[in-house]
């Protein structure tokens, strides 16, 4: 007989991923809204801090339960390089995307009146406020440059995540890992974040983008730059994380759980 405790145990890991991504988006998109929609001068650093705090809080709430992936690209990389069960990948990714949807919905509900004022009315919704939740590239960026920017930043992210979980390479304790991720995201945003708003995470972009579609932002969300939403913030991070994992395990990792074994 299945008990409530059994069902709770069955969904505990996906729910940790759900709340982790929801917190990531609440802090990150919330910071973007507060900076852009206020009368204060825009500050990319403030937005950068918001996303960095979000990744740290998301990792803290989920790390000891689900591993704190809070990113489909990292989940797939962990399945490829660290033996994470492939059968759990779909439930993790679904939970991560839904967390992005709910996180964006909560931020939108909190700032809806400010968005109305900024846009000039309740039924006016443009890319100017969509970009507070989903990622868009700067106008001068080519398609190849957009892809490479997301690929490169996610490769660095994946390499560092594998380093932070490598007990043979001075990995921090569980309590310090979120702080290390905070520092990592500050660095990634400061160095590689300007041109594409550094999604690095399919759930962080696709979840909020799905919510925006439900909120009335229209087809432009998905028609922008020939389906930018698919190849830049989804495909590029997934491939970038695979590349980062390949580099780390080929040249640095000495464990037995990698498919790349030198012994």
From Swiss-Prot:
Recorded catalytic activity of this chain's protein: H2O(in) = H2O(out)
InterPro entries, per database record: Aquaporin-like, MIP, MIP/Aquaporin, MIP_CS
Domain of life: Eukaryota
Transmembrane parts of this sequence: 18-38, 45-65, 89-109, 144-164, 175-195, 228-248
Extracellular side: 39-44, 110-143, 196-227
Chief place of localization: membrane
Alphabetically ordered keywords of this record: Membrane, Repeat, Transmembrane, Transmembrane helix, Transport
Motif range (NPA 2): 201-203
Cysteine disulfide links: none
Residue intervals on the Cytoplasmic side: 1-17, 66-88, 165-174, 249-263
Gene Ontology CC annotations of this record: plasma membrane
Secreted found in the keyword field: no
Subcellular location: Membrane
One Pfam family cited in the UniProt record for this chain: MIP
UniProt comment concerning the protein's domains: Aquaporins contain two tandem repeats each containing three membrane-spanning domains and a pore-forming loop with the signature motif Asn-Pro-Ala (NPA).
Protein name: Aquaporin Lacbi1:233199
């Amino acid at each position: 007989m299945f008990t409530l405790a059994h069902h709770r145990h069955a969904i505990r890991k996906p729910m940790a991923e759900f709340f982790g991504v929801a917190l990531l988006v609440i802090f990150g998109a919330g910071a973007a809204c507060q900076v852009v929609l206020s009368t204060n001068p825009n500050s990319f650093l403030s937005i950068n801090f918001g996303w960095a705090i979000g990744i740290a809080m998301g990792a803290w709430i989920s790390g000891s339960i689900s591993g704190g992936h809070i990113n489909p690209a990292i989940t797939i990389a962990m399945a490829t390089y660290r033996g994470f069960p492939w059968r759990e990948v779909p439930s993790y990714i679904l939970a991560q995307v839904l967390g992005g949807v709910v996180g964006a919905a909560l931020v939108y509900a909190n700032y809806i009146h400010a968005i109305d004022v900024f846009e000039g009315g309740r039924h006016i919704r443009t890319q100017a406020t969509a970009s507070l939740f989903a990622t868009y590239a700067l106008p001068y960026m080519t398609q190849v440059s957009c892809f490479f920017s997301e690929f490169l930043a996610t490769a660095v992210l994946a390499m560092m995540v594998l380093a932070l979980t490598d007990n043979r390479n001075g990995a921090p304790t569980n309590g310090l890992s979120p702080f290390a991720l905070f520092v990592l995201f500050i660095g990634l945003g400061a160095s590689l974040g300007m041109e594409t708003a550094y999604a690095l995470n399919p759930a962080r972009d696709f979840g909020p983008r799905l919510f925006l579609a439900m909120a009335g932002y229209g087809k432009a969300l998905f028609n922008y730059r020939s389906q930018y939403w698919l190849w830049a913030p989804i495909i590029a991070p997934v491939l970038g994380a695979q590349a980062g994992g390949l580099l780390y395990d080929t040249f640095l990792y000495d464990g037995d759980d990698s498919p790349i074994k030198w012994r």
